[in-house]
Amino acid sequence: MSREVPANGGDAADLPIFTRRRAIQTAIVVFALLVGIYFLFPKLVGLGNALDRLGEANPLWIAVAIGFNALALGTYVALFKAVVGGEAMPLSWRETYEINMAGLAATRLFSAGGAGGIVLSFWALRKGGMPRHEVARRMVAFLALQYVFYPVALIACGVLLRTGVVSGKDSVELTVVPAAVAGLLLLAGLLMALIPPDVGRRLAALARGERSRAVVANVAKAPAIVGEGLRFTAGLFLNPSRGGLAVLGATGFWAANVGILWATFKAFGVHVPLAVVVQGFFLGMVANLFPLAPAGVGAVDAGMIGAFVLFGIPEETVFPAVLVYRLVAFWMPLPFGVVAFFQLRQTAQRWEDEGLPFDRPVTIKNEVPTADGKKAAPEAPISARRPRK
């Protein structure tokens, strides 16, 4: 019989990201942005309708792009299972798929910067019985391992392009500036990893009065968890035997996404240097953080188009290539994500009826790799733990 985990996530119907009003608002915004980017703007700049050249695409290269997309989704699921599932909470591959694909739909339909997917994943893991603190710590590690490739790619390609090691436009604004900003962000992440887990206690000791100490301790919880998650991420990198699948999943996810874009350019008979594809891809994806566009719809399209035009790629090729990329990488998986959301609701109900994943027995101890290359002291087997909030 499964133990009860207090406040394990609430009912699926209470998820704020899935409401009829939000869906209608999102549909209107998405439609307006897509019409503006792919119909109105090309006409204003004298390029005609961006859809006119879609019929010229080579079907073989479109098939290659779809294959890369399947690889991207598979590696994304593997990344999540390696960081969040496994011995931490023995999720099956099907359960991991449902959480990830449902989160993908939430991210792409209801929020910018991935927040919708984070909310849904947090809910699902809490429904599965994982303690709140552990969910937060592992979600930080999952996101950090996934997005660390942003600054790394911008730095690497920026330096290679600027120094002429690889072919492509080497202007400062497309190479040095992005690399410098990425370097600062990477440095900030490394410094945050140094935040000690007891930072709240240390800072509270400096505050005056019980109320002030309580406020300081509560505020410090978030950076403390971020620090723990980042150190966990570093441990995965430094322990290939434990973190190999996670690192491979994150690497494969971004490599496959870049592969989709590369294949769509090939579909229109245009050769774009690989370093330019990577740099333009990540520069465009920064627009995903644009707050008014759901999952960067319209903003990412415009960002990628602008980046490649600045790199000297002909506008009449950039528009259809980016459009096809977004159709394959963004819109094609969406129906699967919506179906996975409803499957996940049924799975969450089954967990409550048949037992929580967090209660499932495991054959190994929950040893967590640390950044110094050592394994943390083993805890009790998961199935033997007492309920925790």
Residue positions per predicted region:
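Transmembrane alpha-helix interface/packing and boundary motifs in multi-pass membrane proteins
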Residues: 102-112, 265-267, 281-301
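Hydrophobic alpha-helical transmembrane segments
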Residues: 24-28, 62-66, 93-98, 175-180, ...
